[in-house]
Swiss-Prot record:
Annotated family: Belongs to the IPP transferase family.
Binding-site positions, substrate: T19, A20, S21, G22, K23, T24
GO molecular function terms attached to this record: ATP binding; tRNA dimethylallyltransferase activity
Keyword annotations of the record: ATP-binding, Magnesium, Nucleotide-binding, Transferase, tRNA processing
Gene: miaA
EC identifiers of the protein: 2.5.1.75
Name this protein carries in UniProt: tRNA dimethylallyltransferase
GO biological process terms, semicolon-separated: tRNA modification
Length: 324
């Protein structure tokens, strides 16, 4: 046996929660007490020039504690769960080697699942296949492609809305490249490796005891983003020749709705309402993912002392005062 297989895994604290649950405040509170470096678990924060609509940590916040996996790619590019897993495992090793403590923080549960449970053996993105599907959608509409998906992968089609362009495209792409439905590939055993075996990931979950309070926070935060110049931010991105609404970056919550408004497809009030609704739907999905983790340590994110509670939970994890 190798020395690494005999040694006790290094515990990694993971601060997870839906949007507007107070993750940044809790992470910064921990940074004030311990030499941590924050590794973002957020699929929107990877993009440069998308600051307001992603609620990216401020320049001062990022100066007070090292942050990783923020502003690492251009909005015209894509970033996969596989890339996140490889980057995060590398960063954890580097942070530990520096004698500091990594803290994973974010709300992209697909990334967290890929990190901790491994990856499904799905084919990578193929630009030619995607271009062909985009052309079909432009001609026939996404509901027609949804109907096509229902013929080859009824299980996946049944859980997707007819206009969910990103997921419909990906499911059809997988079938065209592999000859197998995505649902069957996802049901297959995950591809595992020893890369994550050196670590024990412990999730601290910020969850609301009353969703109405979190929904009010979401509305307040979206309005604050609008006041801070979110529409201008999207307009600057829109003026680029290489961006369009079907890119993963522009599908981020809020950006799609702002793009529709700038295209003249909706009025301002409708854009605001749709942006808030989309954020609430994202929050609902994030909470569903969290509640499927029986090992998580739950902190009520709407409690008056939620930051202190989260800080205490994180310190208990890092001090080894949690059950194995």
């Amino acid at each position: 046996m190798s020395a690494s297989s005999q040694s006790r895994p290094t515990t990694i604290a993971c601060l997870l929660g839906p949007t507007a649950s107070g993750k940044t405040a809790a992470a910064l509170a921990l940074a004030a007490r311990r030499p941590i470096e924050i590794v973002s678990v957020d699929s929107a924060l990877v993009y440069r020039d998308m600051d307001i609509g992603t609620a990216k940590p401020s320049r001062d916040e990022r100066a007070s504690v090292p942050h990783h996996l923020i502003d690492i790619i251009d909005p015209a590019d894509a970033y996969s769960a596989a890339e996140f897993r490889a980057d995060t495992l590398r960063l954890i090793g580097e942070i530990v080697a520096r004698g500091r403590t990594p803290l994973l923080a974010g709300g992209t549960m697909l990334y967290y699942k890929a990190l901790t449970q491994g990856l499904n053996d799905l084919p990578g993105a193929d630009p030619e296949v995607r271009a062909a599907l985009d052309a079909d959608a432009a001609r026939d509409g996404w509901p027609a492609l949804h109907a096509r998906l229902a013929q080859v992968d009824p299980d996946t089609a049944a859980r997707l809305a007819p206009n969910d362009s990103q997921r419909i495209q990906r499911a059809l792409e997988i079938f065209m490249l592999s000859g197998q439905p995505m649902s069957a590939l996802l049901a297959a055993p995950r591809r595992t490796d020893d890369a994550a075996a050196a670590y024990r990931f412990v999730p601290v979950a910020l969850e609301p005891s009353d969703r109405a309070v979190l929904h009010a926070r979401i509305a307040q935060r979206f309005d604050a983003m609008l006041d801070a110049g979110f529409i201008d931010e999207v307009e600057r991105l829109r003026r680029r020749d290489d961006l369009h609404p079907d890119l993963p970056s522009m599908r981020c919550v809020g950006y799609r709705q702002a793009w529709e408004f700038l295209d003249g497809d909706t009025d301002y009030r409708t854009m605001r309402d749709k942006g808030i609704f989309a954020t609430r739907q994202l929050c609902k999905r994030q909470i569903t993912w969290l509640r499927a983790m029986p090992e998580r340590i739950v902190v009520d994110c709407i409690a008056p002392d939620s930051t202190a509670r989260a800080l205490d939970a994180l310190e208990r994890v890092l001090d080894g005062r949690t059950p194995d």
